[in-house]
């Protein structure tokens, strides 16, 4: 898999002038409202950049590829599997509930909340679509934690939310295979998880319609993807 990286800003651009390629650094991460940045950047070591080692290429979900029947436990403690969503367009994204960075998991959940609202405006379409937020932190994201998080991001404490949007976590042993399939990189680090972003639209036939790497996509794009996939089914 390609090297994993999370982008950080600095308030004082002058702190970057003392850095060079290959430097290891330590810094304070400051998170405030909808923004985050680094302060007190210090060089802790240096190693010349090395070429990437040879290895197998990362798997990238391709349109038309059938998604394996991965299994999870949802926010209600029920076992669910990918296959049971066949017949509906399934929108999938990855999060962990403790993520503090606004541009990462909180953005994915905010975007999915908007998609949930938009699809809900069309009764026929809402019945043909389903949203799935998958945690890659199964040790911490228990069913109760996922349930509380779901109510928070959905803006509702009605269990009816879960009829169209579920929050799930896999068994820890299954997580590497699931993450690899969806090209999700993650690494526990300093009590948090450094990770990439991965979002997919899966057709009613259980095959990939479209895969989005990163977090630059907008809710209307996925709403259109879901609508088009649902209409093709008719």
Residue ranges of model-derived segments:
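N-terminal "domain-start" segment that seeds a small globular fold
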Residues: 42-82, 107-117
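Short active-site neighborhood of thiol/selenol oxidoreductases, capturing the structured segment around
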Residues: 80-111, 131-132
């Amino acid at each position: 898999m390609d090297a994993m990286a999370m982008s950080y800003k600095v308030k004082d651009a002058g702190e970057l002038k003392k850095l060079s390629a290959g430097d290891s650094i330590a810094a304070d991460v400051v998170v405030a409202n909808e923004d985050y940045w680094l302060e007190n950047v210090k060089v802790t070591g240096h190693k010349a950049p090395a070429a990437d080692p040879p290895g197998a290429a990362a798997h990238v979900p391709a349109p038309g590829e059938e998604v394996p029947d991965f299994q999870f436990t949802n926010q209600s403690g029920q076992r669910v599997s990918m296959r049971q969503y066949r017949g509906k367009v399934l929108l999938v994204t990855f999060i962990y509930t403790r993520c503090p960075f606004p541009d990462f998991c909180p953005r994915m959940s905010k975007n999915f909340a908007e998609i949930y609202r938009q699809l809900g405006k069309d009764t026929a379409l809402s019945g043909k679509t389903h949203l799935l937020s998958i945690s890659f932190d199964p040790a911490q994201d228990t069913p109760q934690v996922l349930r509380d998080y779901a109510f928070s991001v959905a803006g509702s404490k009605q269990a009816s939310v879960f009829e169209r949007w579920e929050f799930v976590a896999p068994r820890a042993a299954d997580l590497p295979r699931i993450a690899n399939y969806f090209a999700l990189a993650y690494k526990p680090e300093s009590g948090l998880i450094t990770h990439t972003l991965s979002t997919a639209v899966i057709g009613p036939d259980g095959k990939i319609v479209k895969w989005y790497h990163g977090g630059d996509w907008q809710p209307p794009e996925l709403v259109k993807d879901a609508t088009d996939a649902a209409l093709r089914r008719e």
